[in-house]
């Protein structure tokens, strides 16, 4: 995890291993120029273009509990992930994934800010959400805009606003995570009835 944040905070960042790993790489000569998203059991990956030359980024998040193996056996873990993608999806990598890098995913357990209020931290560096929340990119953009407003003098309460927003996102994302992963038909029935009423509540929708 970021050593820079540790230096800025002058304390260890409050993070923990999320029992998942990220595999990133580059694909070339792709015929499909669209953004592709694949959701599977215990893994998902995204393929998106980075230029007009049919070059693409590939990023996957896979459930993986053995942190020591991730640290010490990169090639073995890479092959396991690639085999899983090949066996459980129709996406064919054809040994075309280059510049692969593998790293464990850490998420934040607490909201920590620097003592120096002239230092602004944003995105995952400020608070790393679980990848399943799908909030990384949007919160990076949103927090960068809030920093801009602070620098322009339009606002002066960046960290206070971020703390409130992060708490809302965590609560809502946790609710969604459990509410939409029910398998019992009876539980799903009552969930759907509850959502019909909640969807009419403006406070719930905020």
Model-identified regions with their sequence ranges:
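Active-site-proximal flexible loops/turns
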Residues: 4-6, 111, 131, 149-150
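Short, cationic motifs built from Arg/Lys/His that form the positively charged side of catalytic pockets
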Residues: 5-6, 123, 162, 191
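C-terminal helical "tail/cap" subdomain of flavin- and related membrane-associated enzymes
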Residues: 91, 133-134, 149-206
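FAD/FMN-dependent oxidoreductases across multiple families
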Residues: 51, 60-135, 139
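Short, small-residue alpha-helix embedded
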Residues: 138-152
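Conserved FAD-binding catalytic core of PHBH/FMO-like flavoproteins
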Residues: 1-90
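Active-site micro-motifs of SAM-dependent methyltransferase domains
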Residues: 2, 127-128, 160, 165
């Amino acid at each position: 995890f970021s050593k820079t944040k540790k230096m800025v905070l002058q304390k260890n960042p409050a993070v923990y291993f999320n029992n998942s790993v990220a595999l990133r790489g580059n694909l070339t000569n792709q015929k499909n120029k669209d953004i592709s998203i694949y959701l599977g059991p215990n893994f998902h990956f995204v393929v998106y273009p980075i230029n007009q030359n049919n070059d693409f980024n590939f990023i996957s998040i896979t459930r993986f509990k053995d942190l020591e193996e991730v640290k010490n056996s990169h090639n073995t873990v890479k092959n396991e992930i690639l085999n899983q993608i090949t066996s459980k999806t129709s996406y064919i990598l054809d040994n075309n994934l280059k510049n692969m890098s593998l790293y464990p995913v850490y998420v934040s357990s607490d909201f920590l800010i620097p003592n120096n209020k002239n230092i602004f931290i944003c995105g995952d560096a400020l608070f790393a959400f679980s990848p399943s929340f799908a909030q990384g990119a949007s919160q990076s953009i949103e927090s960068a805009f809030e920093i801009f407003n602070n620098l322009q003098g339009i606002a002066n309460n960046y960290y206070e606003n971020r703390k409130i927003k992060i708490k809302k996102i965590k609560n809502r994302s946790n609710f969604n995570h459990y509410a939409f992963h029910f398998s019992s038909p009876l539980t799903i029935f009552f969930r759907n009835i509850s959502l019909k009423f909640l969807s009419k509540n403006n406070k719930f929708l905020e």
